[in-house]
Amino acid sequence: MDVRRRSEEAVYSSKVFAADEKPLKPHKQQQEEDNTLLIDASDALPLPLYFTNGLFFTMFFSVMYFLLSRWREKIRNSTPLHVVTLSELGAIVSLIASVIYLLGFFGIGFVQTFVARGNNDSWDEEDENDEQFILEEDSRRGPCAAATTLGCAVPTPPAKHIAPIVPQQPAVSIAEKPAPLVTPAASEEDEEIIKSVVQGKIPSYSLESKLGDCKRAASIRKEVLQRITGKSLEGLPLDGFNYESILGQCCEMTIGYVQIPVGIAGPLLLNGREYSVPMATTEGCLVASTNRGCKAIYASGGATSILLRDGMTRAPCVRFGTAKRAAELKFFVEDPINFETLANVFNQSSRFARLQRIQCAIAGKNLHMRFVCSTGDAMGMNMVSKGVQNVLDYLQNEYADMDVIGISANFCSDKKPAAVNWIEGRGKSVVCEAIITEEVVKKVLKTEVAALVELNMLKNLTGSALAGALGGFNAHASNIVSAVYIATGQDPAQNIESSHCITMMEAVNDGKDLHISVTMPSIEVGTVGGGTQLASQSACLNLLGVKGANREAPGSNARLLATIVAGSVLAGELSLMSAISAGQLVNSHMKYNRSTKDVTKASS
């Protein structure tokens, strides 16, 4: 069905007629008015329509069954077929009556519909042109925004004020009355769709599938939202984004996109290679501070980063009738003899998935199984979930009394601070270290080695312990992790466990130089899938040299990205701790992170 076709009510309301002039109606509607005087087949009995139909349907099949039975009996007894009893005669009459009714109700009406449609399928001249235009628009594959380039320019009605639908509010004075919401005029067909969505006739979520144009759907949805809420979305951009690229994988119900500035910190000298680290943030001074840390590391000979573990996790929960049965499955899963079988079942989910181990925990008659597997260059949540489902299906055959409560039961643990991630790790576990010379500490960081060591002990260790921190033994690791994650298309919500970090500082070389390290047990990153395929994020990954999958060594791009994240955190920790030690934190934030500019004017 063409959702953009204008309703009859809209057609009538779109024209202004003179006092003595009647609006033209489609002949189909006029025919319906004329047919009100005709007698239909359903008027055969003074009964409701469904009773009449049911009666004649029952009569038809009952009589047909009776006549067929009698016919078969006559053939079996060699009775002449033309010899008809009174009951058979009544059955024949009933059959003819039911056939006439059913043909009159269904067949003739169906034929009349096509005959009437062939003779009267026309509107008045203006409406026919409008309908033809809409049908031509439906066959066009290009978006409306590109109409001028495709040679199908659409006439646009003059711009006008569109009054938003807002709740009735008490009257206010002229001085307090807000300015009316002004939006660009939509085309006539878009206007009809907007009205249908506002009225609830068309679901907003179905616009992409009905229109076949993601950008146009976002534009219409944005206008609908403005009219319903009465709030302007003028500052939310719509153009300049490929909405087709996010359909079905990144975002639903789109109305635009937000703009986050991206800065560059570096070069970061890590494992003998230089990296320019993209950081998407709205916090002033963050990129500048991280950049200063990179400068200090570079001047001191660079940093070293080591990958300790690489394994994404998923932990389903199953329930048995007794705790004994749950323990039996625990012993079965943890038995090394059975691991190879379970691994083969798990690894069938993907050519990159490789099961590493299964860690079990019992809570009464419930068993939580934490699956750990490598996932190549993908972050791997979907991959490991598919593998877990395969294993659960296999175990269901062996343990018929096993009840699967959920494929994810928080023993993973995803997007939550958890001791299991802090201790066992999740994703990539990385440690990064550097030795900062005394000269660099004084000239670049403007502080002393002893002051940094003391501050780290009292702030990152003692202070965090007093606060009951879980994985938060650092200054601001999440700042750097979030900024790099947004820039490179990672899942920002996984910043929670990815920012687990303990920062250590120690004076070395007779107290002259500073040894600094960050240990991050659960960095969850990928270079394929999710937001990594978006143009901006893909460009940032390309800048780091980790775009896409590594065909020669699967998984190496994601592991390299994890080490870069850890190296960036090291730079950020070094610079912020130095600023606090030197008493520069407040001054720098007042200079770079506090502005008196009118941002609304700048954006307009």
Swiss-Prot record:
Signal peptide: none annotated. The keyword NADP applies. It is an enzyme of class 1 (oxidoreductase). Residues 189-604 are annotated as: Catalytic. It is a multi-pass membrane protein. Belongs to the HMG-CoA reductase family. This is 3-hydroxy-3-methylglutaryl-coenzyme A reductase 2. The lineage of its organism: Eukaryota, Viridiplantae, Streptophyta, Embryophyta, Tracheophyta. The gene is HMGR2.
